[in-house]
Each structure stands twice: as structure tokens, then as C-alpha cells.
Regions:
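Hydrophobic, membrane-interfacing alpha helices
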Residues: 1-302
Length: 302
């Protein structure tokens, strides 16, 4: 069911691209098909490589790969899709199709409702499944946080922003990528990901590198000394985000310094993750806006 849903979304996006692109529809169709093919190949290769490296057995990797357990391959597929579009379509065509790509991303996220989702958070004890639209049962019937739903909402919001900015003639691809990357750092806090580097998830580091690359002034567009202020600000907030991640994973260490009684200690342990999640969400929005402004100035050549 999930694979059929993915295939339907790809076909609908291709049809939408042909409708939106008024000139040179043949080249648009070729570029879209090439990007889809590159994404599929990269997704398969990356997923198989990750399984082989984790299991250490070629037979086990083939068995698990045939069952479709290749969640981390989505990252490689997305990168291949974007790079192919950038190389073949050119900047202007990619800018025009940016809202469509964001709608495609939102649709792919929402399609996880019909398959084992990659964007499912940890189990929530004592919470009924119907308590919130952000709650979904996993394969064992336990209520979990459906992180893919706010991720889809973020993509829809970015699609609306890209459509409005595109009509004003402003570059949209870099700013939207910055906002999505910054917000994804927060969404990764809510996921149960086994890929860890210390207490920070590797996906968060990848998103931070995207932000730094967008603000990097070494492309020749921006060589003013003030350009490095963007990078320093983003890197500093990334470090703070890492500390918040540590506080969410190890709340009892913070609670020991805040309370000495049993009741106070329990209350502090419960409060620390909530406060850190709120701070992380606000910090993600600020990081996204700062990086978006830097990326837009780079795109405009200022």
C-alpha cells in the first residue's frame, strides 16, 4: 500500500510539473524523470549499504531490504533528487518548481499514514491513541508521537511561503531549504533515531551543515567580513541546541542541581524535557530565519 501511494504521488507531481511549466514541457518531463530515477537509485543503494554495514551479513541485509526496512535511504534519495534537479533544470526552472517540490514533500510525509512511518516518535505511556491528532499507534498498538504530521504541516507552510515569494520575484529555494533544515533539527528531537554521535543525532548535524553551507560566504557572492557573523550565529545556536538535546536525554542531571527532595526531584525531571522542547522549538525558528536571510542574500548576490 505504501509503495503504491509513493508511486501515485510521484506520477501526480510529474503531471503537476508539466501543467505548471508553460514552456519546454519535454525538457521538464525529462528532468523530472531523471530526478526520480536518481532518487530511486540513490535510495536503494544507500538503504542496502546501511543495512549491510549494520548487520555485517549480506544475506541478512538482502532479507531486510526486501521487506522494505530502509528508512534512512530517504535522505540519500532526497539529496539525489535535489542535486539532479539543480544540475539539469537550472536555477530558474528549479525556483519555479520549488512550491511543487514542497507539496511533494508534504504528500510523501502524509503518505506515511498508509505504511510503517519513518517519522514516528517514542512510545507515550498513559496517553490514549485518540487524545491528539499527533498521536498514532505503532505496530504493537502502543500510542506514539506522529512526528511526520507536523513535518508535513511545515512543508505545506513552506510551500505557501515559496509561492508568495516567487510571485514577488524573490529567490525561494535557499531560504526555504534553510527553514526546513532548521525545523527538522527540532523534529529530530521527537524521533527515536538510533544514529547517534554522543548525545546529538547525526541527522541534526546534517541539518546544521546545510544551514552553514547556505550562509557560507566563500561562493564569491559575499566576501564582506560581516558575512561570517551569520555563520558564527548559526554555529552558536547549533551548540545551544546540542545542549538542549543533552538536557532532554538526561533530565535527571539537570534535576539534581535544581531539587534535593524526592518530590522536587520528580517534578524537575518531568519539567526539564518540556521546557527544553519549548526552547528548542523557538530556537529552531530563529535559526531558520537567520539562515534564510543569509541564504537569500547569497542568492541575490548581495
Amino acid at each position: 500500500m505504501g509503495r503504491l501511494c509513493f508511486a501515485g504521488i510521484w506520477l501526480l507531481s510529474l503531471a503537476a510539473a508539466l501543467v505548471c511549466e508553460k514552456e519546454d514541457k519535454r525538457k521538464t518531463a525529462f528532468v523530472m524523470l531523471a530526478a526520480f530515477a536518481a532518487a530511486a537509485v540513490a535510495s536503494v543503494l544507500a538503504g542496502f549499504a546501511v543495512l549491510w554495514a549494520d548487520m555485517g551479513s549480506l544475506t541478512a541485509a538482502v532479507q531486510w531490504f526486501s521487506e522494505g526496512r530502509t528508512q534512512h535511504s530517504a535522505v540519500a534519495g532526497s539529496i539525489a533528487f535535489v542535486l539532479t534537479m539543480h544540475c539539469l533544470a537550472g536555477r530558474e526552472r528549479t525556483e519555479r518548481l520549488a512550491p511543487l517540490f514542497l507539496l511533494l514533500l508534504a504528500a510523501l510525509r502524509l503518505s506515511e499514514a498508509f505504511c510503517p512511518p519513518a517519522g514516528l516518535g517514542s512510545e507515550l505511556e498513559g496517553v490514549p491513541p485518540a487524545f491528539s491528532p499527533l498521536i498514532r499507534e505503532d505496530a504493537y498498538g502502543d500510542p506514539c508521537l506522529a512526528v511526520y504530521r507536523p513535518e508535513a504541516a511545515a512543508a505545506l507552510l513552506c510551500a505557501l511561503t515559496a509561492a508568495v515569494q516567487g510571485r514577488k520575484g524573490k529567490p525561494t529555494l535557499f531560504p526555504i531549504a534553510c527553514r526546513l533544515a532548521a525545523w527538522q533539527i527540532f523534529f529530530e528531537n521527537l524521533l527515536t533515531s538510533p544514529l547517534m554521535l554522543g548525545f546529538v543525532r547525526t541527522e541534526q548535524i546534517l541539518c546544521l551543515l546545510i544551514l552553514l553551507a547556505a550562509a557560507f560566504p566563500g561562493t564569491g557572492m559575499r566576501k564582506k567580513p560581516g558575512a561570517w557573523g551569520w555563520i558564527a550565529c548559526i554555529a552558536a545556536m547549533g551548540a545551544v541546541h546540542g545542549l538542549l538535546q543533552f538536557a532532554m536525554d538526561k533530565p535527571y542531571l539537570i534535576a539534581e542541581a535544581a531539587a534535593h527532595t524526592d518530590e522536587g526531584f520528580d517534578a524537575a525531571v518531568a519539567a526539564v524535557p518540556v521546557v527544553c522542547h519549548i526552547l528548542a522549538a523557538l530556537l529552531s525558528v530563529v535559526m531558520g530565519e537567520i539562515a534564510a536571510r543569509a541564504g537569500q542574500r547569497n542568492a541575490e548576490g548581495k
